[in-house]
Design a protein with these regions (language model features):
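Secondary-structure end/capping motifs
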Residues: 224-308
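Conserved C-terminal helix/tail region of periplasmic/extracytoplasmic solute-binding proteins
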Residues: 297-330
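Sec/Tat signal peptide C-region and signal peptidase I cleavage site
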Residues: 22-27
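Sec-dependent signal peptide hydrophobic core
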Residues: 8-18
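Extracytoplasmic/secreted envelope proteins and their assembly/folding machinery
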Residues: 42, 46, 73, 88-91, ...
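Pocket-lining segment of extracytoplasmic ligand-binding domains
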Residues: 90, 169-261
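N-terminal secretory signal peptides that target proteins for export/translocation
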Residues: 1-6
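Short, glycine-/small- and polar/acidic-enriched structural segments
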Residues: 28-173, 177, 181-187, 201-204, ...
């Protein structure tokens, strides 16, 4: 009986210790609602969710897919989403047009944008008098299209612009409506477009130079009050990115793309190969590309004539302090 009593007390003590150790973590579990555009760039999020990188840092992350950039920007401004990942020109638009105090805190990729066209469009000149479709007419990837068209002899007055929303909506519009002559699309929608017989007038980065596509941005006030949460989120994101592009995880990462993007295995394999390319894929550790961001500002200055055509210094839109802390803690 003495031994049973001792063993019972030991088990009780062990149970109490386990509770004492785990309770603080459980009590600190933080719910986040974020918004992203559907696409290849979400590999870090898919990995962080499936591998428990968020959970082990006390985070429960609800990932919402953006129907368009208007909802993403407005949702961030009104607190529906705490963190968003999108073309960083959206953050600049929030700061300059809506006068919202934002900070870009992390990079992601160059956008992987290509100018996709209907099969009968063989040259830029063939787009004269046609309708091009965009997410929103005055932000981000639309500027890439306008500039590619301008460099090839087409001014804004030479074509119509129709906003339809995110990449999946633009591809759908082009497949259902032949009058939707062209759109900027990114991965894996460019692969789907090719499989459906649509044409391709080339890569935006090859035509226009370095470009900061996807990045993470937040309200500065929220970040200041939730710095630890933001750092933990970024650590999980970076860990997810590292896991996703690691060759030893290729089969599992491919499955994530198959499930999340409804791709067949061949297309998912191709998508992962592009995402994990050491120089042309998702940016290592989601670093921001300074030259790419300068070009984002330059495009807004040139296309929208913002800032009287002279882009400001990038620093006013950036806060790298959270990223530095996140990386240091990995």
């Amino acid at each position: 009986m003495h031994h049973i009593n001792w063993a019972t007390k030991l088990l009780a003590a062990a149970a109490w210790f386990a509770t004492a150790v785990t309770s603080p973590l459980q009590a600190q579990t933080t719910n986040l609602t974020i918004m992203v555009f559907q696409g290849m760039q979400n590999l870090p999020l898919l990995a962080a969710q499936s591998q428990g990188f968020f959970a082990k840092r006390g985070l429960k992350v609800d990932v919402r897919i953006a129907p368009d950039s208007d909802e993403l920007r407005e949702g961030l401004a009104h607190g529906r989403y705490q963190i968003v990942h999108a073309g960083v020109d959206n953050a600049v638009a929030m700061a300059e047009v809506a006068k919202i105090d934002i900070a870009i805190v992390m990079g992601g990729d160059n956008g992987f944008n290509r100018l996709i066209v209907q099969p009968e469009i063989k040259t830029y000149a063939d787009l004269r008098g046609k309708t091009v479709i965009v997410d929103a007419p005055d932000t981000a990837f639309a500027f890439l299209m306008y500039e590619m068209l301008r460099k090839n002899g087409l001014n804004k007055s030479d074509y119509e612009v129709r906003p339809v929303g995110a990449s999946f909506r633009r591809l759908d519009a082009m497949l259902k409506d032949k009058s939707a002559a062209a759109a900027m699309l990114n991965m894996p929608f460019t692969l789907r477009a090719a499989a459906e017989g649509l044409g391709d007038l080339g890569s935006a980065v090859e035509a226009l130079g370095p470009y900061q596509g996807t990045g993470a941005f937040v309200l500065r006030q929220w970040a200041a009050g939730n710095s630890d949460v933001l750092v933990r989120y970024m650590q999980a994101y970076i860990e997810g990115l590292r896991w996703g592009v690691d060759p030893k995880n290729r089969a599992d990462a491919t499955k994530l793309y198959i499930d999340a993007l409804k791709l067949n295995e061949a297309m998912a394999t191709r998508t992962l190969a592009i995402a994990s390319h050491p120089t042309d894929g998702l940016t290592r550790d989601a670093r921001l590309d300074p030259d790419g961001f300068k070009n984002v500002l330059g495009l807004r200055a040139n296309v929208m004539k913002q800032w009287a055509g002279s882009a400001p210094a990038p620093a006013k839109y950036l806060d790298g302090s959270y990223y530095t802390k996140a990386l240091a803690g990995l």
